[in-house]
Structures are given as structure tokens and as C-alpha cells.
A protein has these predicted regions:
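Glycine-rich FAD pyrophosphate-binding loop
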Residues: 26-46
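Beta1/beta-strand and adjacent pyrophosphate-binding region of the FAD-binding site
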Residues: 2-17, 33
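Short, basic/glycine-rich phosphate-binding loops at helix/coil junctions
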Residues: 128-135
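Short beta-strand/turn micro-motifs composed of small residues
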Residues: 13, 36, 99
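Helical element adjacent to the flavin cofactor pocket in flavoenzyme catalytic cores
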Residues: 137-150
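Dinucleotide-binding Rossmann-like beta1-alpha1 core, especially the glycine-rich loop
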Residues: 50-126
Length: 150
């Protein structure tokens, strides 16, 4: 086995995870080849690049893991942007979770991390929201990455 072979890696799957792994190996002087069937089929492309630890209603250790991960993202994105000279479109825009009644809102696992929105506030945040949604939580710490950039 040659030194070049030892420092080569093949990654199957060009979604968020595959490309993230490829990036990290590349930064560590590995020769990387990514095989991807169809970028538009990847989960990250479909999920709209959401960074929604709180809006997803995660609990316990998974919530803690999500919060820690989300805190690392801005620094990681900055390194990607510096290395590639391409903006990733990180937006701390917040994510709204609507509720039909206040009881469901108060039982939401990450309720205490959100800003309460009454019906009027909810309509202001999401213009044209169906009137069946009476309450909402705005998770200002959540956001998204523009994952459809090329």
C-alpha cells in the first residue's frame, strides 16, 4: 500500500453528512472522493437546511447534544467559508412552531426555550397563517443554512 493510498478515502453519499465528513478529511490532508447518486435526493436538501434543535422539540440528552452541536456550527461554517471562499448562507432567523391550543404549546418539550406568540404575533411572524393556529413559539436561537447553493 502506497502512502497516497493510505491517505485516500472514498465517501459514499453526498448529503450533509457525507460532505461534512469529506470536508474534515480534506482539511486533514486526505485525498477525498465523494460518490453521490443525486444531490436533490439527499435528506439535507429536502429538509431545507434547518437548524432546529428547539423547534423539533428534542428532549433530554438529545436536546443537550443538539444544543452543543448548534453552538459549534457558526465557527465550523466560518472555516468552510474561509476555505472555499463561498458563503454558506447561515441564518439565525428563528423558527416558529404553531399550536392550535395553549395546552399543547405548554406541553411542548422545549417550551421554556421559546418566545410565546399570541394569535396576532403569530400572524405577524407568518403572514397568511391559517387561523386554526392560535398560539406559537418562536425559537430565535434556531435557524437554517442555505443548503441549495451551488
Amino acid at each position: 500500500m502506497t502512502q497516497e493510498t493510505k491517505n485516500s478515502i472514498l465517501i459514499i453519499g453526498g448529503g450533509l453528512v457525507g460532505l461534512s465528513i469529506a470536508y474534515e478529511f480534506s482539511r486533514n490532508n486526505f485525498k477525498v472522493l465523494v460518490l453521490s447518486k443525486n444531490r436533490n435526493e439527499s435528506a439535507g436538501f429536502v429538509a431545507a437546511g434547518m437548524l432546529a434543535t428547539h423547534a423539533e422539540g428534542l428532549e433530554d440528552e438529545l436536546l443537550k447534544f443538539g444544543q452543543e452541536s448548534q453552538n459549534l456550527i457558526p465557527k465550523w461554517i466560518k472555516s468552510i467559508e474561509q476555505d472555499s471562499n463561498i458563503k454558506c448562507g447561515l441564518k439565525k432567523c428563528g423558527i416558529v412552531v404553531p399550536f392550535k391550543n395553549k395546552e399543547d404549546l405548554e406541553e411542548f418539550p422545549t417550551y421554556e426555550y421559546g418566545k410565546y406568540l399570541n394569535h396576532k404575533d403569530l400572524q405577524t411572524e407568518i403572514n397568511g397563517m391559517n387561523s386554526i393556529w392560535k398560539h406559537g413559539l418562536l425559537f430565535e436561537q434556531d435557524g437554517q443554512i442555505d443548503n441549495r447553493r451551488r
